[in-house]
Design a protein with these regions (language model features):
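Conserved catalytic region of serine esterases and O-acyltransferases that act on ester linkages
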Residues: 139, 162-165, 169-245
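A structural motif corresponding to the C-terminal end of an alpha-helix
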Residues: 24-29, 92-104, 132-144, 181
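Serine-esterase "nucleophile elbow" of acetyl-processing enzymes
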Residues: 1-38, 52-62
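Active-site segments of SGNH/GDSL-like serine hydrolases
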Residues: 69-73, 95-127, 148-154
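Oxyanion-hole/transition-state-stabilizing segment in secreted/luminal serine hydrolases
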Residues: 3-5, 30, 45-84, 110-111
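Structural recognition of the beta-strand scaffold that forms the well-ordered cores
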Residues: 33-38, 64-69, 103-107
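Substrate-gating cap/lid alpha-helix
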Residues: 113-147, 168-171
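Charged helix-capping and loop-helix junction motifs
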Residues: 82-90, 122-129
Length: 245
């Protein structure tokens, strides 16, 4: 999410909510610098073992804002073990907390359309994931961005065609939610939901579902079978601090 997946592209990189937040923060601080170590598809152990150690040298106490959003990719795996993932998540926050940084974490939408087994499993896993995020945030004093406070997130029109990542409008709204939580300038229109969507015909809805399965679900399953990830071979957008204006 923090890489900016499925937002508009700028200079060959997804823009994303974090870049948008950086735009506002930089206006208030002439010495503002920005690092974005997020890489799509990474699991908790990869974030903890690789990204956190890479971030620590650039943290200088509470004036450094660090966002941590990891674990959702673990939840989506068939062999997901909640207790192991929860412990890893807390370790990540614990490691970052020791630096004195100001931490920000996120819950996720724990309900999706439908009443089948997939929707039920999604709710069971992600509702428990959210409870863990809240508990860890409280324990370590992290700022939490609550999906429950942003009902618009349940609207599929804010998701990209993969139905997993935010689209451009979704990233913009999330950036404004974060800025509001931080007490910075923000656009209150982020809270306004879209007008009710027109009801789709049975044919259109099922055609879109079929296209989605062919375009996104099958490739995802094929990567899992081969032990591959969409983030393999990719580097972070901004691995070292850059001046942001």
């Amino acid at each position: 999410m923090t890489e900016g997946m499925c937002d508009d592209m700028v200079d060959g990189k997804y823009r994303g909510w974090a870049d948008r937040v950086a735009d506002t923060l930089a206006k208030a601080s002439p010495n503002f610098s920005y690092v974005n170590l997020a890489i799509r598809g990474k699991l908790l152990n990869q974030v903890i073992d690789n990204q956190i150690p890479a971030a620590v040298p650039y943290i200088s106490g509470p004036e450094t804002l660090v966002s941590f959003h990891a674990g959702a990719n673990d939840v989506l795996r068939p062999n997901y073990q909640a207790e192991i993932a929860f412990a890893k998540y807390e370790k990540g926050i614990s490691d970052l907390s020791k630096t004195g940084a100001t931490l920000i974490v996120f819950t996720v939408v724990d309900r999706v359309e439908g009443n089948g087994k997939t929707a039920q499993l999604w709710h069971e896993r992600f509702s428990a994931f959210n409870v863990n995020v809240r508990d860890v945030a409280k324990k370590y004093g992290a700022i939490i961005i609550e999906a429950d406070d942003a009902k618009w997130l349940a609207d599929l029109r804010f998701l990209a065609k993969d139905r997993l990542h935010l689209n451009s409008d979704g990233h913009w709204r999330l950036s404004q939610a974060v800025l509001e939580k931080l007490g910075k300038d923000y656009d209150p229109n982020w809270k306004i939901p879209l007008a009710p969507a027109h009801k789709k015909t049975w044919f259109r809805k099922n055609s879109e579902n079929l296209i989605w399965i062919i375009t996104f679900v099958i490739p995802w399953i094929w990567r899992r079978i081969r032990g591959r990830s969409s983030g393999d071979g990719r580097s972070a957008k901004y691995e070292t601090p850059i001046s942001w204006k």
